């Protein structure tokens, strides 16, 4: 019998329990690859568990379902020895949108000069880290060329909940901010579900594309085990009703191989903004 693989995920929403009940059932009953799931309250705790050594006074897991920031932190803190395994098709080609009130005074990036930009949680790649980074590339520096109104809700979950993006949109609508930065998936939801009056907001800028989540294995995990885990993921079929329920809940149609070229911008931004400093929990474990 195969050794159990311990997989970590962050419980950013109650649906995460349902998703991982379905994933565990698939791996154990169909893929014949036994897994157990550990839910964490923050990505920092999950990354610490992924990189923990025997004897450390923290939980240990073999594989983590990480955000892009958590994957890059795992990579940095393991001296680039952690193993990227797989990602969702929908993790490819994310973008950040800057939105403003339609017909208002902010219609281009240049109009942000001396105005207020709303940002999401400080550890959200799409709603905070990358917007600041990309705007700096465009010659707009936070605190010098524009002010920020930050909504640090659900810090530790890397923007997964969407709560801070909802706050950003509200701030733009009620005039507390002149524009706001949100992820392209949230912007699609705003429009498709009509979360604001139709035509109330317009996108004034779109970032270059980047990638989002990544299954990440600890450095010491046997590469054959990581490969079997990835192969089991790719055998999930959207045409299978039991698989589809899990895939829909997790927001994808199929699992794909790692596309590592979509993380360069966030890696640069995270290093510059101090997100690769070792967390207290990991320092204590060592």
State the predicted function of each range.
Residues 1-72:
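Extracytoplasmic small-molecule ligand-binding "clamshell" domains
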Residues 2-9, 14-22, 217, 221-286:
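An extracytoplasmic/periplasmic, membrane-proximal ligand-sensing/linker region
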Residues 4-30, 40, 93-168, 245, ...:
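Bilobed "Venus flytrap"/periplasmic-binding protein-like clamshell domains
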Residues 49-111, 122-123:
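Acidic, polar ligand-binding/catalytic clefts
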Residues 52-66, 115-117, 167-182:
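Alpha-to-beta junction loops
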